[in-house]
């Protein structure tokens, strides 16, 4: 579990599920992402940026990047998965690993 700064974000990873809780002007937004690619993944927070009312989180594991975009005004969440080229790995990028529970 990892807590991030402004706006308040909480990420929790269990098995193949990632739960995201974000405090927005509309209140608390909670959403769950399930993917078989998350099952044995050791997720790393690669970046967190707030741009034009959107919070962008980039998480990674191995050759996969998980791009999460939260629209703070509406609480809408977008989740995308991207595969890195075979020569790249998230392990070589700076960031903080999430702990599994």
UniProtKB/Swiss-Prot annotation:
Q: Where would you find the membrane-spanning parts of this chain?
A: none
Pfam annotation, one family: Bunya_NS-S
Q: Which BP terms does GO give this entry?
A: viral process
Q: Which residues form the signal peptide?
A: none
Q: Which family is it part of?
A: Belongs to the orthobunyavirus NS-S protein family.
Q: What is this protein called?
A: Non-structural protein NS-S
What species does this protein belong to?
Maguari virus
Q: What is the lineage of its organism?
A: Viruses, Riboviria, Orthornavirae, Negarnaviricota, Polyploviricotina
């Amino acid at each position: 579990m990892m807590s991030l700064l402004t706006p308040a974000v909480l990420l929790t990873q269990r098995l193949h599920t990632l739960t995201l809780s974000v405090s927005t002007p509309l209140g608390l937004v909670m959403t769950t992402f399930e993917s078989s690619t998350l099952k044995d993944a050791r997720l790393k927070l690669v970046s967190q940026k707030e741009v034009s009312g959107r919070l962008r989180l980039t998480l990674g594991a191995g050759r996969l990047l998980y791009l999460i975009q939260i629209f703070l005004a509406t609480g809408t969440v977008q989740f995308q998965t991207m595969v890195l080229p075979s020569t790249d790995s998230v392990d070589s990028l700076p960031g903080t690993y999430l702990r599994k529970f």
